[in-house]
Design a protein with these regions (language model features):
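Conserved acidic catalytic loop of the alpha/beta-hydrolase fold
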Residues: 1-13
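Conserved hydrolase catalytic core segment
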Residues: 11-50
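A catalytic-pocket lid/entrance helix-loop region that shapes and gates access to the active site
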Residues: 34-86, 212
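Small-residue-rich helix-loop
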Residues: 121-132, 158
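Active-site nucleophile elbow and catalytic-triad environment of alpha/beta-hydrolase enzymes
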Residues: 140-158
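Short beta-strand/loop motif that positions the catalytic acidic residue
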Residues: 161-162, 168-170
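Conserved alpha/beta-hydrolase "acid-adjacent" motif
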Residues: 175-181
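Catalytic active-site module of serine/aspartate enzymes centered on a nucleophile-bearing elbow/loop
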Residues: 192-231
Length: 231
């Protein structure tokens, strides 16, 4: 992100991120505080051990038991105590056929737990290139603890960014990234507008969620105009 900022010649910018991107955006702000003007974040993901366990081992399995069973049963029983490790192993093996089967199961599982939000699930045919790239990136980072020094990296360093104006929207029924993560983050921020969007889930494209995000953008546009006038 910093290389992109430098390439574009931007002094300070507003960062808009969702889901996995919120973790990346928050870490960027922690390291490049002086370059972040404001932030809009949707579906807070802190990438903690608890977050990963909830989605890939237990937690969401109690809400989508049939979908999770398919995700779990692809892995031999002797490896089911650590599904993230088992999928990571298959994603980066030399057997391309096995890799693609594993990625398809992984990807379709994630889509199915968002099914109530009218998410389009690809046919059970060829795996999509976007599914491969996303799965490999996710597994690589999740399995390696995001390459962070500790397992609660963001919250342990959020003090550094507590005075950045941050706008956060999180769906009440977001099962991919839980509301509790947003709540823990917001408790540590001084300049935060936090909206729990009732009836919304993880997708930014539903009517209720997009309405909130558009309002955030309009608010920031007005603030940017005022900043220009005061120069």
């Amino acid at each position: 992100m910093e290389k992109i900022r430098l390439h574009l010649g931007i002094d300070k910018w507003t960062i808009f991120a969702g889901s996995f991107g919120t973790a990346l955006a928050l870490v960027y702000a922690i390291h490049y505080l002086q370059r972040v003007k404001r932030m809009i974040l949707q579906g807070i993901f802190l990438a903690t051990e608890s977050d990963l366990k909830w989605f890939f081992q237990e937690g969401i399995s109690e809400i989508y038991p049939a979908e999770f069973k398919k995700f779990k049963d692809f892995i031999p029983k002797e490896e089911q105590n650590n599904l993230l490790e088992a999928y990571h192993k298959r994603f980066f093996c030399d057997n391309i056929e096995l890799r693609n089967k594993a990625i398809k199961i992984w990807s379709r599982f994630q889509l199915r737990v968002m099914e109530s939000e009218n998410i389009m699930i690809p046919e059970d045919g060829e795996i999509q290139a976007s599914e491969i790239s996303l799965a490999l990136i996710e597994a690589h980072y999740f399995y390696n603890n995001m390459f962070w020094e500790d397992k609660n990296y963001i919250l342990n360093r959020v003090e550094k960014i507590k005075n950045i104006p941050i706008y956060i929207a999180h769906g009440r029924f977001d099962l991919n990234t839980r509301v509790i993560s947003a709540y823990k983050l917001v408790e540590r921020l001084n300049k935060c507008e936090f909206i729990i969007v009732e009836g919304a889930g993880h997708s930014p494209f539903t009517e209720k969620m997009s309405k909130v995000l558009i309002k955030f953008l309009e608010d920031i546009k007005e603030l940017n105009y005022k900043d220009e006038e005061n120069r």
